[in-house]
UniProtKB/Swiss-Prot annotation:
One of its GO terms (cellular component) is cytoplasm. PROSITE patterns: POLYPRENYL_SYNTHASE_1, POLYPRENYL_SYNTHASE_2. It catalyses: isopentenyl diphosphate + (2E)-geranyl diphosphate = (2E,6E)-farnesyl diphosphate + diphosphate. This is Probable farnesyl diphosphate synthase. Belongs to the FPP/GGPP synthase family. Binds 2 Mg(2+) ions per subunit. Keywords: Cytoplasm, Isoprene biosynthesis, Magnesium, Metal-binding, Transferase. SUPFAM superfamilies: Terpenoid synthases. Isopentenyl diphosphate binds at K75, R78, H107, R126. GO terms for biological process: isoprenoid biosynthetic process. It is found in: Cytoplasm. Its EC number is 2.5.1.10. The lineage of its organism: Bacteria, Pseudomonadati, Pseudomonadota, Alphaproteobacteria, Hyphomicrobiales.
Length: 332
């Protein structure tokens, strides 16, 4: 595994805001979301390919499966959230790319484990056979374990000032702990076949998927402004944004499990209902859930409005989620 920027890395010393230059803005000076999102996703994928490579003896089946889990599709939303928060200041692009890659490794870890027969038992992910289907269940378990380790190793190896690597590791660890994704998944499994209140589902979603969204934003901000009491108001705004945006993404996912097809989802539709899993969509109904998602996205935008143009990229990710919802779950 190669870590950090190399002497030949042409990103070194270039900020996330400066790496695209004028091409990222239209004639009006407005930042073009399709340009920076495509470029950001490409840079993170290049970092993943660099970080997840065999060093000496060729590619093992485990490494091949790890690359399969991380390099074949995905919207890269969490990495883009990190990059967008990193754009709050002139953060070195190479640092954000590697942090974004670490986040995507951890996200892939959670997906690989969630898809296992003992968990959600899914056979499709991102339009391809899930890791346990293609490589076997034992390898899939090891893939998740190894991706988690590589994510932390990537952060610990960053060429970053002060205690930044420690703070980043702490944020990511907290996101997947018993108070985060792992705890949320445990609750999700425990609710199968039960009638529960909406508040219980919302709390579960905030842990299972929302915690990693929050960490993605906070990790980008840590790269931009560090750990400083002077930025308490900034982190408060970002946490509110993350809470609303992360929950909105999961509500949209609940809706699309009902309304979208395999091509749009990249996974098997109707799985939640078939497994008797309570969701926001099943409890609220599709139209109420849709409005709930729209309200959450609006609240996310209001949370970062005081940050002004610095938060332009975070706002554009809200717009992308809105467009995705309108495309795949139009109003009845």
């Amino acid at each position: 595994m190669q870590t950090g920027s190399t002497p030949h890395d042409d990103r070194a010393g270039v900020s996330a805001n400066g790496i695209l230059g004028a091409q990222a803005r239209g004639a009006s000076g407005r930042l073009l979301p399709e340009i920076w999102m495509q470029d950001g996703a490409k840079r993170v994928e290049e970092a993943l390919a660099r970080l997840l490579c065999a060093e000496d003896d060729g590619e093992t089946e485990l490494m091949a499966a790890m690359r399969y889990a991380t390099l074949h599709g995905g919207k890269r939303t969490r990495a883009l959230l990190c990059l967008a928060a990193g754009a709050l200041a002139d953060t070195p692009a190479h640092m954000l790319d590697d942090v974004g890659a670490a986040i995507e490794m951890m996200h892939a870890c959670t997906l690989v484990h969630d898809d296992l027969p003992a968990m959600d038992d899914d056979v499709l992910r991102r339009g391809l056979p899930t890791v346990h289907v293609k490589f076997g269940e034992a390898t899939a378990i090891l893939v998740g374990d190894a991706l988690q380790a590589h994510a932390f190793l990537t952060l610990a190896s960053l060429n970053a000032p002060g205690d930044s690597p420690i703070a980043l590791v702490r944020e990511l660890a907290q996101a997947v702990s018993a108070e985060g994704a792992a705890g949320g998944q445990a609750i999700d499994l425990s609710l199968v076949g039960k009638h529960v209140e909406l508040d219980r589902i919302v709390a579960m979603h905030r842990m299972k998927s929302g915690a990693l969204v929050r960490a993605s934003v906070r990790m980008g901000a840590l790269c931009a402004v560090g750990v400083n009491a002077a930025h308490a108001a900034l982190y408060c705004a970002l946490d509110h944004y993350s809470a609303c945006f992360g929950l909105a993404l999961q509500v949209i996912d609940d809706i699309l499990d009902v309304t979208a097809d395999t091509a749009a989802l990249g996974k098997t539709p109707g799985k939640d209902a078939a497994a008797q899993k309570p969701t926001c969509a099943s409890i609220m109904g599709l139209q109420e859930a849709r409005q709930f998602a729209l309200d959450l996205l609006r609240d996310a935008g209001e949370a970062i409005a005081p940050l002004g143009p610095r938060a332009e990229r975070l706002a554009q990710l809200i717009q992308r989620a809105n467009a995705y919802l309108f495309k795949h779950a139009p109003r009845a």
